[in-house]
Amino acid sequence: MGKPSKTAFFSAARAWDWQSVTALLVAAPERVETSDLQGHAALHRACAVKPGSNPALHEPNGIRTVTALLDAGADLERAVPMDEAEGDFRATPLWYAVARGENFPLVEFLLRRRANASYSLWAAVWRDDEMVCRALLKSRPNLNLQAHGETPIFYAARLKRLATLAMLIDAGADPSIVDPKGRDALTIARERRLPEQIIEKLESLRHKLHGPLPKRA
């Protein structure tokens, strides 16, 4: 009997069929590192599934399946290859759980396994998801990475995602980091005519982090 196929393994992972995933990994442990044509490992595919999206799913949130993959050696921080323009962003399994799966129980599980939350902040901002953003911030991510030249706090200000913007301000994200056009979060907040309370908080945070702006001659 030959080794199980990549197709069978990935299908089991996407179906959250944790028992089949476990059995297939016993038969072919090297499958845990296999990639599909887009560079996804089975862990990425499992994390991208949305709960309730398929009546054939074998469990409610994929945690048993993801546990089986991690216990077999799947890389928690493995990133799917992306365009260089993405900058600091990495499409990790946690990002797939946040952005594609919208699967909060799995997000919490991955964070407990010490997944790096830094790359998922933009996804939380996109949906202005306070619950996910709060969970990510608890793990003390790097708040000042840039994707397409935008930090999460700049992105939140530009998109007018006020709930997550307020959370990033409270967490101490640096509002002075500029985008490729030379604009910082305070500049874009003014351009977007965000509430004065938000503007004041951004000004206060910038002053706290960097001191007063130099006076013009």
What function would you assign to each model-found segment?
Residues 152, 157-171, 175, 179, ...:
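Structured catalytic/translocation cores of nucleotide/phosphate-coupled proteins
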Residues 1-8, 108-123, 139, 171-174, ...:
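Ankyrin-repeat-protein effector appendages
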Residues 17-25, 53-71, 101-111, 129-138, ...:
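Ankyrin repeat structural motif
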Residues 2-9, 34-52, 79-96, 116-126, ...:
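Ankyrin-repeat boundary/"N-cap" motif
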Residues 1-45, 132-145:
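N-terminal segments that cap or nucleate solenoid repeat domains
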Residues 11-16, 45-62, 84-103, 123-130, ...:
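Ankyrin repeat A-helix N-terminal signature
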Residues 30-33, 73-77, 114-116, 140-144, ...:
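The conserved C-terminal loop/turn that links adjacent ankyrin repeats
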Residues 9-10, 39, 69-71, 94, ...:
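Short, intrinsically disordered, low-complexity terminal segments
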